[in-house]
Structures are given as structure tokens and as C-alpha cells.
Curated annotation (Swiss-Prot):
Species per Swiss-Prot/TrEMBL record: Prochlorococcus marinus (strain MIT 9515)
Catalytically driven reaction(s): UDP-N-acetyl-alpha-D-muramoyl-L-alanine + D-glutamate + ATP = UDP-N-acetyl-alpha-D-muramoyl-L-alanyl-D-glutamate + ADP + phosphate + H(+)
Xref: PANTHER family: UDP-N-ACETYLMURAMOYLALANINE--D-GLUTAMATE LIGASE (PTHR43692:SF1)
A Gene Ontology BP annotation from the UniProt entry: peptidoglycan biosynthetic process
The protein's name: UDP-N-acetylmuramoylalanine--D-glutamate ligase
Places the protein is found: Cytoplasm
Its EC number(s): 6.3.2.9
Pathway listed: Cell wall biogenesis; peptidoglycan biosynthesis
MF terms in GO: ATP binding; UDP-N-acetylmuramoylalanine-D-glutamate ligase activity
Record family assignment: Belongs to the MurCDEF family.
Designated gene of the protein: murD
Lineage start: Bacteria, Bacillati, Cyanobacteriota, Cyanophyceae, Synechococcales
InterPro entries reported in the protein's UniProt record: Mur-like_cat_sf (IPR036565), Mur_ligase_C (IPR004101), Mur_ligase_C_dom_sf (IPR036615), Mur_ligase_cen (IPR013221), MurD (IPR005762)
Length: 477
């Protein structure tokens, strides 16, 4: 969608719905292009009021506590250039349907950014789990090799902030993490140079209704990409091998039947192999878990496609620091390791994390339950966990699932994370525990704003109760 220049006879107003990070930067970027911008936000609080003041100084009108209702547009329909919606608003929202019926264009922040950034080489990364790690890892590899390769999108920096900030800079690669919510609204717009699909499992079905719809949305990004990289270890992607657009495939499997379909794999000597040639030794890298080996292979495959040598990739990876809240070791001694995996927001990501642990951990889980199969999660709990501590909205449901799976060891229920940590402290003192794993397996929205806040609070509680000096990304007072 070209962003039109204003004239007397053209519609003038861009309505931005939602004042989160993407809405803020969409409004700011559009205003920098000389557009008239009005922002609507359904909530109202001190933080939003401060954001409103910032935008109003730029001559952007901001309305807080304003609901996204079609009737609110009735007096200005003829003045609307486009409505830019938050990723949180589904495209089948009744107001969106009515706006489209009136011929009004409905866009996402990604659409707006694409128009200014489409001449840059994009790497579009999507997947149910793993996309943030691959995005961060690949950007690190490229930036360490003196390529200007910011990461943005669903992680960290909104794409419109990149568009706003880089007018005089020459970006080599834009590494964009793209969620299904973002792809859904911009599906025919974004055309990456390289598309990467990390994993696919049941998630966000409250939004996308069916697994097939969710799959098609993810796949649309890969269809639009010039080159594609897939994870053969993922059962859904593997089962669709023949129907998916041609691309590069990676696997951690050692089965010859799998290797026949793949370009990158791990051999018996722990070497990363690229089409029959040893590329790098896996022993150089410290990411925990098979799922992170998959992430590593996806990033390496992309870096090789871009043209980086194995030596340059190796040197970059040696300086890589893992993102917080993803199998993050926050404390380790010769007796105890404490791991924060707050990003494990569904059964599949939690299962992958538990599998990565050696020995029998005690596990803390709980939060707001999401859709998806729990069978493998229950099985790995039953096989490996020494004890389970549950909290939050889903605690009773999770306990029922675990007990039905045959779990015979200790299982406890608490109201919140603070209560859990208080009890876990004494439990560890009285039992031989080598690993404490915080692996919620649920979203955070019953008690926290997001998984980052949940992970930070977990670290803070551990720090205070255990009186430990943590390997933390932030200091706690």
C-alpha cells in the first residue's frame, strides 16, 4: 500500500488504533511524512497519558478511553485515508469488516513500515516457538561481521521505528520477527529476501479458529519469500514437506531418511554438516536443548545463504549471549542450578526445555492455560520431574492432567509465584535437588503483563529468598 501524498482532493486522516509500541511508532512515523494522524486507545492510565503528551507535541491527536466502534467513524468516513490497527485486533473484528465494506483501507504497522523499507533485504522469521531466538541469533551473527542488520518486529523494536530512524543509513539486512497476528494483516504486502519457519504447533487458536487457518497464515510469509528455510524436526512442517514451497531444510536427526531431505544436520561427531561437508563443531556453542540446536542451524543456514564463511559465523557465535527468560541459567553452583524459562508459554516450548535438563529437576508451572496438546508435556513431567509446583489460574487443571498421566511424586498448588518460591526454598533445603526449572507452560496474563515481567519477578523472588548472587541481566535492589 503506497503511502499517498496529501492534496486538497485526497482523504487526509490516518487513524491509528492502539497506543502500544507499534501504534506509537506508526503514528510518529506517519506524522514525520506530513500525514494527519489521530490515535485511539481504549485504555487510560498514567503511562498512556504521558505517551499522549509526547505525541500531542508532534501535532498528533490522541484520544484515550476511546472504543474501536464503527459508529465513532460515522462523521469522518470521507476523510479517512486508512485505519492502522494494533496486532491485537483480529481482522474479523466487526468494526474492521464494516470499514472495509465502506471501502476504507485497514492496515497494520508492518504495512506502513514495508513501504519505506521494501528496498532493504528482509529476513522474515516466523514460527510458534523459537522465532525470537533465531531473530536475535541471526542479527548477532550479521552485526558481528560488520553488517548493519537490526532486529525488529514482534521482538523489541517496532518496524516503524526502524523506518523513522534510518532515513540516512544504509541497512544491509533487516531481521524481522513476524507473528501470525502481524502476518495476517500484511500477508500480501511483505516479500522477504529470506523467510525462516522455525516451528509449528497449536497456538493462538482463540484468534485463528482452526489449526489450518493458523498454518496458512504462517505459510503465506514463506510463499512470499524469495528463499526459504524450514525446520524438518518439526512434525507439522515435515508432514507438509512436499506441499511447501521449495527451500533449505535443517534437522538434528541422525536418521538417513531424514538427512535425505535436508541440507544441514548434526553428524555423530557433533559437527554441523552442510551438504556433506563438516562446517562447524557444535561443541563450541553453549545453548541448552535440542530446540536451541534447531534454532542454531536455522540461523547458520541463513548466514550461509547471505554468504558468510564458517569461520566468520563461528567467531560471531562464540560471543553470543542468550536472551533472558529462555532457558536462562540465573544461578549455578556445584550443588544447584536455577533456570528461568518464563518464555515457555505453551506445552511444546515447556516440553523442549524440560527435555534439555540433565537429571531430575523440580519444576514450577502455571499461568493462563493455552490450547494445544498436553500429552508429551505430561509424559516428560512423569519421566523426569522430581516434584512439581503449580500456581495461578491453571493450577488445578494442570494438577489433574499430571495426576491422570500417572505422576506419583510430590505435587503442590499455590496461589501465586511468591508463595511457590517461599515453599520451594525449604523444599530444596530438605531434599537433594540439583535443578530448579521455572517452566510455566502457560501464558502470563492471569497475573502478569507479559512473560518478561513474570521472568523478572521470578528472578527477583529467587534473589530475595535464596540470598543468591544471580547471573542476572539486571540488578535487583
Amino acid at each position: 500500500m503506497p503511502i499517498k501524498n496529501n492534496s486538497k482532493n485526497e482523504k487526509k486522516i490516518y487513524f491509528v488504533i492502539g497506543l502500544g509500541r507499534s501504534g506509537f511508532w506508526a503514528a510518529k512515523y506517519l506524522r514525520s511524512l506530513g500525514k494527519k494522524v489521530i490515535v485511539w486507545e481504549s485504555n487510560e492510565n498514567e503511562e498512556l497519558s504521558e505517551t499522549k503528551e509526547i505525541l500531542e507535541k508532534l501535532d498528533i491527536s490522541v484520544c484515550l478511553n476511546k472504543q474501536f466502534l464503527f459508529e465513532e467513524f460515522s462523521e469522518c468516513l470521507n476523510q479517512i485515508e486508512a485505519v492502522v490497527i494494533s496486532p491485537a485486533i483480529p481482522i474479523d473484528h466487526k468494526t474492521i469488516i464494516k470499514l472495509k465494506e465502506k471501502g476504507i483501507e485497514v492496515l497494520g504497522e508492518v504495512n506502513i513500515a514495508w513501504e519505506s523499507l521494501k528496498n532493504i533485504n528482509w529476513i522474515g522469521i516466523t514460527g510458534t516457538n523459537g522465532k525470537t531466538t533465531v531473530t536475535h541469533l541471526l542479527s548477532h551473527i550479521l552485526r558481528t561481521n560488520n553488517l548493519l542488520a537490526p532486529f525488529a518486529g514482534n521482538i523489541g523494536t517496532p518496524l516503524c521505528k526502524i523506518a523513522y530512524s534510518i532515513k540516512s543509513k544504509n541497512i544491509d539486512w533487516l531481521v524481522a520477527e513476524l507473528s501470525s497476528y502481524q502476518i495476517e494483516i500484511a500477508t500480501l504486502c511483505i516479500k522477504p529476501k529470506i523467510g525462516i519457519w522455525t516451528t509449528f504447533t497449536a497456538d493462538h487458536l482463540d484468534r485463528h479458529k482452526t489449526l489450518d487457518n493458523y498454518f496458512k497464515i504462517k505459510n503465506s510469509l514463506l510463499k512470499q519469500s524469495e528463499f526459504r528455510i524450514y525446520n524438518y524436526d518439526d512434525i507439522h512442517l515435515r508432514e507438509n514437506f512436499k506441499s511447501l514451497s521449495k527451500g533449505i531444510w535443517i534437522t538434528t536427526s541422525s536418521k538417513q531418511s531424514d538427512l535425505d531431505h535436508c541440507d544441514y544436520w548434526i553428524n555423530n561427531e557433533d559437527f554441523i554438516v552442510e551438504r556433506q561437508e563438516n562446517l562447524l563443531s557444535l561443541k563450541n556453542f553453549k545453548l541448552k536443548g535440542n530446540h536451541n540446536t534447531q534454532n542454531l542451524l536455522l540461523a547458520i543456514a541463513a548466514a550461509r545463504k547471505i554468504g558468510l564463511s564458517p569461520e566468520k559465523i563461528k567467531n560471531a557465535l562464540l560471543s553470543y549471549e542468550q536472551l533472558p527468560h529462555r532457558m536462562e541459567t540465573i544461578y549455578q553452583s556445584n550443588k544447584l542450578e536455577i533456570i528461568n524459562d518464563s518464555k515457555a508459554t505453551n506445552f511444546d516450548s515447556s516440553t523442549a526445555g524440560i527435555k534439555a535438563i540433565k537429571g531430575a529437576p523440580i519444576i514450577i508451572s502455571g499461568g493462563k492455560l493455552k490450547s494445544g496438546s498436553y500429552i508429551e508435556w505430561v509424559n516428560i513431567i512423569n519421566k523426569k520431574a522430581k516434584a512439581v509446583f503449580l500456581f495461578g489460574e491453571s493450577s488445578q487443571t494442570l494438577k489433574k492432567l499430571i495426576l491422570e498421566g500417572g505422576f506419583k511424586k510430590d505435587i503442590f498448588i499455590f496461589n501465586d509465584l511468591s508463595e511457590v518460591i517461599n515453599y520451594v526454598y525449604s523444599y530444596i533445603e530438605n531434599n537433594q535437588i540439583e535443578t530448579l526449572l521455572f517452566s510455566p507452560s502457560c501464558s502470563s496474563f492471569d497475573q502478569f503483563r507479559n512473560y518478561e515481567e513474570r521472568g523478572d519477578i521470578f528472578k527477583k523472588l529467587i534473589h530475595e529468598k535464596f540470598n543468591l548472587k544471580l547471573f542476572a541481566h539486571k540488578e535487583f535492589s
